[in-house]
Amino acid sequence: MIKVLVTAIGGGGHGDQILKALRLASPGRYRIFGADANPSCPQASLVERFVTLPLARDPNYLDVLLRTCKELGVQALFHGCEPELQLFCANRKIIEGAGIFLPINDTALIQLCMDKAKTNARLAALGFPAPNYVNVTSESELEGIDWFPVVVKPAVGGGGSANVYVAQDMKELQALAVYLGLGSITSGFMIQEYVGTPDQEFTVGVLHDLDGRYVNSIAVKRHLSSGLSVRTSVANRTGRKELGPRLVISSGVSQGDIGRFPEVTSQCRAIADSLGSRGPLNIQCRFVDGKVRVFEINPRFSGTTSLRAMVGFNEPDLLVRRHLLNQDIGQDAPFQEATILRSLVETLLPRGGATGVPA
């Protein structure tokens, strides 16, 4: 049995998703250990052994992590949040030097995708149509923007739609700049053109092995109609009817129709190939006039990893089988097509313990 450690399994992030996917793999393949900074982690009952780790920004984090891996005999290490992804990336040689399989993408690609403006620029240079965008650091730089509505978001960092806003005209954009403290509280942010309609939105996974060989791709056509999946929904007052009656930003919690969607995944595979992906890659996009319009790329396992595993496309398991078990995992293996919906799950934690019991 392969001993794996999944970090940051609490909080409903992609660590939780990786854990769920590994639990869906063939029985007897894994001994799964879990870690989180929160000792009262609801997922603690789902792993063979749970350990509490410091936050990734703690200077002792790496030492504690490596000591934990040695004590548990960990063979494969999965990150569960983006601060850990960046730390694992920066310390790849140390972790791999300890004999631990680290299924993360290429260092240069991770660094590129953490900067949204640089990602957009690279896509444009490679010939893929990206929405208009600009990084701004002062209010005077807003004056040249004439492609409303726009999405205002942090220029660096990861997904989850955190701190993302919609501005429908210059007045709203200037008000947002004041609200966000442009030039004072924040040094800058990215402004990106809002494109397409909510029913054209996809989250797409393109998997390559760590040697850069293409494995498979899958898409979730998002259902952006519930409070769980929607961060922002406002009436469209721009007069641009092609954008639909409402302007909608996803919360990052994806649910919907899952399948091949070849018209979408083929274009996303071309993007991943061109970027030189070596590992998991997740592309957030809208499909407009026959073209994929990318608004974000996350070079990691997705918040839909367990959904993909439910239909037979288990990315964490595939990478372990390919690189640790030396199995032939093929290419474009078939998987089920389905609609997968999500809901909240309550967990009862007995006082004095961190063993979770789903209600």
Language-model-detected regions and their locations in the chain:
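Preference for protein termini
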Residues: 1-35, 70-73, 210-212, 226, ...
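ATP-dependent carboxylate activation and anion-phosphoryl transfer catalytic cores
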Residues: 72, 257-359
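Active-site nucleotide/adenylate-binding loops and adjacent lid/helix of ATP-dependent enzymes
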Residues: 110-198, 208-213
